[in-house]
């Protein structure tokens, strides 16, 4: 909050007071300049300290204060303190609008858009970035226009990428809304590229080429993606930008993987590995090793795959990346099985189990347990195949975990496994003791793998009484115990809506606000009746005092609107004097807001509804040594076609020989896109 405004310097008698104010102004400016110098040197923490000190001293120069707000917001952004960055960029926007600084308003809107994008508030970010674009075009600022186009493209790209991660789909296999979002990103990047070519800005052209390549990669246009990434690579080499060059090689490798050119992809990943060592970035070095390990798995060179996965494991341990360490152990287990070394594979499977338990990865834990049981059976350490067919699932049903991929213990691979959530919620009785493998055509749709989802007319089979058929080779079905919700004689829908209405009716009373009538018995008169009392009451009729009721609502809402208004006098570091009070009062626009303002307001308010939605279940954290583009689902499909070639011929019983290999499709890796 701003401190009480002292009198202006010219209002105080004597030159001493004027010298004091001059020193205060000089002190504020000097502190801000030192903060700017430190931020340019990369010391953002120290820079923030000087900027905050400048705000504490305060200034009556509105332009200086606006610049301090902008610099503070940027410094907090680089420190990843996005809430504080958002706060100061809002201060900057408010002050710029108040003094009528259109260019300052454009820059503040752009900074707000970038911060909102990082916070995942994409719709609000688009509104702010569009405001930046509109003002830049209005002022004829070509550089600002290009920057605004690039920022809008970034917001659409980030939104599309997040949606594709949530959908857990491969590049090119995306829902229509995600594709539309990415097409919008591509349009703005194309406009940005055209403008920066006109301006002759080669560095900006490189950024546009790189982002166009990334967008086309997500859309599944892999040939176009390689074209753009080659342009990005050429410009990075032109500027000697090793970090950008490394990213271009990595992106080229990802695109060539999906084009089926695994050997070309391996060469690009090797270049990535060399550059990551040159710039001394261990995290990206580990990512390159991981990508090379997966590439050599696709090339069926399992010894080299294991070599690179071991390098990944060592770096992940050095960086304390437990997610990456677990993924490396899982990959090493599969590689050693493919090389015919189940004993070494068992060691890594046990390590994978331990790490999955530590980080709370339920899917990984189930996968590791099944791998261990399978490998122990193959090594002859289990006396009964039933022990491998029934791994320890205790605690999974109670905690509601739904493993996505599991392993089959027959001659083929396990298919996608999901628990029927609707039955779990409706409380039907299931027993975990009898495992049954119905054919794929008889499974309900949520329990089929993506590979078999094209069958539209599947019907669920119920377990037969007294049946003890062996494990079918098609699928495995995990069944859950009865939940605590009793079944009503009515249908599922009636039961659900009955429970919902009872629950919601009790919540309504909690949201009522008492009316201040000033009478002693008002509290008793407005007390909410209990559930039983409401059930006995007749239906409520309309009140005759309708006008008074709406007047009450209007007065209440008007007070709430006043509470939400931004006050210029509350800006930190602002000293209001006679010199600047005219700017604060006179530069506002007296005319009524136009359609553009109301359209922007509607978009903003509609995005606020999403903030009140329940968040989806948390996904696994992404370790620093794990690349964003994992392409592991491609390995799953390729490996599924080569299962016969990868089987290990172990001496032992027929059961051991038929047990097969741990399926590399058991678990979707964190970060798969």
From Swiss-Prot:
The modification Omega-N-methylarginine is found at residue 418. The modification Phosphoserine is found at residues 410, 442, 467, 469, 490-491, 543, 567, 653. Residues 420-477, 510-544, 609-628, 645-673 are annotated as: Disordered. Residues 516-530 have a biased composition (Low complexity). It comes from the Eukaryota. Its main location: endoplasmic reticulum. Residues 493-515, 546-568, 594-616, 628-650 form the GoLoco domain. It is a peripheral membrane protein. One of its GO terms (molecular function) is G-protein alpha-subunit binding. One of its GO terms (biological process) is establishment of mitotic spindle orientation. Isoform 4 is specifically expressed in brain by neurons and also detected in testis, liver, kidney, heart and pancreas (at protein level). Highly expressed in cerebellum and subventricular zone-olfactory bulb system. Isoform 2 and isoform 3 are specifically expressed in heart and are also detected in brain. Belongs to the GPSM family. Interacts with INSC/inscuteable and FRMPD1. Interacts with GNAI1, GNAI2 and GNAI3 preferentially in their GDP-bound state. May also interact with GNAO1. Interacts with STK11/LKB1 and MACF1. Guanine nucleotide dissociation inhibitor (GDI) which functions as a receptor-independent activator of heterotrimeric G-protein signaling. Keeps G(i/o) alpha subunit in its GDP-bound form thus uncoupling heterotrimeric G-proteins signaling from G protein-coupled receptors. Controls spindle orientation and asymmetric cell fate of cerebral cortical progenitors. May also be involved in macroautophagy in intestinal cells. May play a role in drug addiction. This is G-protein-signaling modulator 1.
């Amino acid at each position: 909050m701003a401190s009480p405004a002292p009198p202006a310097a010219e209002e105080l008698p004597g030159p001493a007071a004027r010298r004091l104010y001059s020193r205060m102004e000089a002190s504020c400016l000097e502190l801000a300049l030192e903060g700017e110098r430190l931020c340019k040197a990369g010391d953002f923490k120290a820079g923030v300290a000087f900027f905050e000190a400048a705000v504490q001293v305060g200034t009556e120069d509105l332009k200086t204060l606006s610049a301090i707000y902008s610099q503070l917001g940027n410094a907090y952004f680089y420190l990843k303190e996005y809430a504080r960055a958002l706060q100061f960029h809002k201060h900057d926007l408010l002050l710029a609008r108040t003094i009528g600084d259109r260019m300052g308003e454009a820059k503040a809107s752009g900074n707000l858009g970038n911060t909102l994008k990082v916070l995942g508030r994409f719709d609000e970010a688009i509104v702010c970035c569009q405001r930046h674009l509109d003002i830049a075009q209005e002022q004829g600022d070509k550089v600002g226009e290009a920057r605004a186009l690039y920022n809008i493209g970034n917001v659409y790209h980030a939104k599309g990428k997040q949606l594709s991660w949530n959908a857990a789909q491969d590049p090119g296999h995306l829902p229509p809304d995600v594709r539309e979002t990415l097409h919008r990103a591509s349009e703005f990047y194309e406009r940005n590229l055209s403008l920066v070519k006109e301006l002759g800005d080669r560095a900006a052209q490189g950024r546009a080429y790189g982002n166009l390549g990334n967008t086309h990669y997500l859309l599944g246009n892999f040939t176009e993606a390689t074209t753009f990434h080659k342009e990005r690579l050429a410009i990075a080499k032109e500027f000697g930008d090793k970090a950008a060059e490394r990213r271009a090689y990595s992106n080229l490798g990802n695109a060539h993987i999906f084009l089926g050119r695994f050997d070309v992809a391996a060469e690009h990943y090797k270049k990535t590995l060399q550059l990551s060592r040159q710039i001394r970035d261990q995290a990206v070095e580990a990512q390159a090793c991981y990508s090379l390990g997966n590439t050599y798995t696709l090339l069926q060179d399992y010894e080299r795959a294991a070599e690179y996965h071991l390098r990944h494991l060592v770096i992940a341990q050095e960086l304390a990346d437990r997610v990456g360490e677990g993924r490396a152990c899982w990959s090493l287990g599969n590689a050693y099985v493919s090389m015919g070394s189940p004993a070494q594979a068992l060691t890594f499977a046990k390590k994978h189990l331990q790490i999955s338990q530590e980080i709370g990865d339920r899917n990984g834990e189930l996968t590791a347990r099944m791998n261990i049981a399978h490998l122990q059976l193959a090594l002859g350490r289990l006396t009964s195949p039933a022990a491998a067919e029934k791994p320890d699932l205790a605690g999974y049903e109670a905690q509601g975990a739904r493993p996505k991929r599991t392993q089959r213990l027959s001659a083929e691979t396990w298919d996608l496994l999901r628990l029927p959530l609707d039955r779990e919620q409706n409380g039907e009785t299931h027993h975990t003791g009898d495992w049954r493998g119905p054919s794929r055509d008889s499974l309900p749709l949520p329990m089929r793998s993506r590979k078999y989802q094209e069958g539209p007319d599947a019907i669920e089979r119920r377990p037969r009484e007294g049946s003890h058929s062996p494990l079918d080779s098609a699928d495995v079905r995990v069944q859950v115990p009865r939940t605590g919700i009793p079944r009503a004689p009515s249908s599922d829908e009636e039961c659900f809506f009955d429970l919902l209405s009872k629950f919601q009716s009790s919540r309504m009373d909690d949201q009522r606000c008492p009316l201040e009538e000033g009478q002693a018995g008002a509290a008793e008169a407005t007390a909410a009746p209990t559930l039983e009392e409401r059930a006995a009451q007749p239906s409520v009729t309309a009140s005759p005092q309708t006008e008074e009721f709406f007047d009450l609502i209007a007065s209440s809402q008007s007070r709430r609107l006043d509470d939400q208004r931004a006050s210029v006098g509350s800006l930190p570091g602002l000293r209001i004097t006679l010199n600047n009070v005219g700017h604060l009062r006179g530069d506002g626009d007296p005319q009524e807001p136009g359609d553009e303002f109301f359209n922007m307001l509607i978009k903003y308010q509609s995005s606020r509804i999403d903030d009140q939605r329940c968040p989806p279940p948390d996904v696994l954290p992404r370790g620093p040594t794990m690349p964003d583009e994992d392409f592991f689902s491609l390995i799953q499909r390729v490996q599924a076609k080569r299962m016969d070639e990868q089987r290990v011929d172990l001496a032992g019983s027929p059961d051991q020989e038929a047990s097969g290999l741990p399926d590399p499709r058991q678990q979707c890796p964190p970060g798969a896109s």
